[in-house]
Structures are given as C-alpha cells and as structure tokens.
Amino acid sequence: MNKTADPILTIFTPAYNRAHTLPRTYESLCRQSCKDFIWLIVDDGSADNTAELVRDWQSRDNGFTIQYIYKENGGMHTAHNVAYANIHTELNTCIDSDDMLADGAVEKILRKWDEVKGKGCAGIVGLDADFDGKIIGKGFPDGLSETTISGY
C-alpha cells in the first residue's frame, strides 16, 4: 500500500516511565511494510527519559509521523482520554508501551478497512498474541468473520 498525504490510522501508545520498553514498540512500527499511519505517544507524567527517546525518534526519517503529548500523571485512562481528544484520523488502535505490532499489521488493517468501510461497519477487531504468535485469551468462535456488537 502506498503512503497517503493524510493517513487514516493513528496508533496511540499511553506511556508512563516506559523508556525501557518503548523501543520494542518503536522498532515494530519501523518494521511495518506500510507506514501510512501516525504514532501518537501520550506520556502520562514520566520521570524517566521517555521524552528524550521520543524526541530522538521524531528527528529520524521513520517513514511515519510521531506525535508526542506530555501530561501530568493521572493514570492510563486519562492518557486514553487525551489520545482520543487528539486523534483526527478515521481509524485508531492502541498499542501498549510494552507491546509490539506484528509485522504487516498496518497493511492488513488498512486493506480490511477498505473492504468493510462501505458496509456500515464502525470498526474492525483483532486479537492479541504473544511473541510466538499464540492468541492470548479466548479467540473468536469458529467460523465468525463478521458480527455486530450485540450479536457477539
């Protein structure tokens, strides 16, 4: 997929003193085959070197835009609220500060959205997996490809 002038996907990451784990998240975003997204990091009052790390990444040619917002510590839910108030793209997803995005995920998200956005869908849902690709928690029921929130 080609990069557009105005990405439709924001990947947001709430972070609090996570300079030791954020590089894994950053590296997974750099490995994406499609860089048509914005990475929004909401720093929830970190006292470590999170800000310096992000400033360094912002100065690099990563192929995607990195936005950084610092706020006073208030908990992850307040970081989510700040993220949602600052997201201006059609789609968004949250990647925690100690997680990584699977290779090719952005391309899959955007392709799937192209397939379903005209069908009255509000979004798409994926599952979390561990580093070996094993689904964390309960997977979707066999044969489920589309549903409504009330139908699940």
Predicted regions and their residues:
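Nucleotide-sugar donor-binding/catalytic module of glycosyltransferases
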Residues: 1-152
